[in-house]
Amino acid sequence: MNIENINTLGELVKSGYKSKSIKDELRENLISKMMSKETVFKGIHGYENSVIPELERAILSKHNINLLGLRGQAKTRLARLMVNLLDEYIPVVEGSEINDDPLNPISRFAKELINEKGDETPIYWLHRSERFAEKLATPDVTVADIIGDVDPIKAANLKLSYADDRVIHYGMIPRANRCIFVINELPDLQARIQVALFNILQEGDIQIRGFKLRLPLDMQFVFTANPEDYTNRGSIVTPLKDRIGSQILTHYPEDIETAKTITKQETDKASAQKEFIQVPELARDLLEQIVFEARESEFIDAKSGVSARLSITAFENLLSTAERRALLSGDSKTMIRLNDFDGIIPAITGKVELVYEGEQEGAQVVAETLIKNAIKTLFPTYFPEIKKLEKQSAETPYDDIISWFFNADEDFELLDEHTEQEYKNELDKITPLNAFLEKHQPNMNTVDGYFVKEFILWALVEFKKLSKHRFAEGTQFRDPYGNFMSGL
């Protein structure tokens, strides 16, 4: 059907166009995509076997949907991607405030226009990208905002009495007729406003200021909400929950690979930095492990959640830390160092909600602890495990490295201002590290190897095999008894 040649109601009827409800559109287009094995929700990772099948079932059932989950779980993005399941264009009566269907008008304006002009009634075609409306539920939202109200200025200009329904100013919901309408953070909507949604969800009509006005709106509602026990500002009233067809629980990525995919997708915009900053795979793993540690931490409120935005902003900070270092040292290319992870602490402290014990420790200490715990968790997946209880005489794969520090003439320091070559030269001084890497990670990329060497040193500190001291200009590593001996 060539929509460019269809500009009036008569031409639309001749074309054989048949109108259908928005929920039928979503259902039919979903079926078509599923049959052709097309990816429906592109850019959503980790939900393939959990959330997406439930969402598809809800669409097939023609339900209004509530996406329930913690912060940063792609709830709003899922709702926005549903637009791709709509028909590309639909006809609308020209001049209609509420997107009237020319074949099934519901407003007084559209009905009178069609009665007056008949087949010559002008129409225009609305693209699916314009069929998405979104409202963030805030405590100051009123019924007039979302449903509508009497407009006294309109009444005065048109010289109409308040008894005439033409004085109505429609709110966001009627104006989103034949659209997907999303209300974010539904529990924040006052209970009396939630009550105003009852009729729309069940009967599809609205009531404005006592007008006996029946508008059978055709809409797909999607709500998003945090779990009630976390949202202190309110809850979803029970009769409203009863009218929402499907409630779908979202979740965080369940493994590091999925989390890495999400972070990479969301940070690909920073391509200018990536041209001269190399990011070892281990650094990506470590960054995601920090977020996983945060979700399990006793210092962080689990009910609040740890958003996927943490790993995204932390990765951006990590790149910027390396970029700043390279600019100051004059390096044209650089790679991520473990010292650079100090730069992600502001991203962590701004994204986590601490419990009482965490407040006592302090946000900075909690963030540093998360980095240390992530190193301890990841280390055994790459290298031999360091057991807590070992016989004093037992040999370990790390003995040569530890002995090097014991016999070193001076403390080993990695300065923040080291150029790339100076950094590599310093790590190359620890000759046992090279032999250790060749034995346990023979396929390791040579350049990534320097980050891995530093990672080994940090891990040995966490397992009490070495000691580490952070000072203003960098980090100092020494034999575990070095601090004790220097104090004598």
Description of each model-found segment:
Residues 58-61, 84-88, 203, 293, ...:
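Amphipathic alpha-helical interaction surfaces
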Residues 263, 287-291:
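Short alpha-helical scaffolding segments that buttress acidic/His motifs in well-ordered protein cores
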Residues 69, 273-280, 293-370:
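C-terminal helical "lid" subdomain and adjoining coupling/linker elements of P-loop NTPases
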Residues 357-372, 376, 383, 396-399, ...:
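Elongated, mostly alpha-helical coiled-coil "stalk/stator" tethers of large membrane protein machines
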Residues 151, 292-293:
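Short connector loops/turns at beta-strand edges and beta->alpha or beta->beta junctions
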Residues 2-257, 268-285, 298-302, 379-488:
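Conserved ASCE/P-loop NTPase catalytic core
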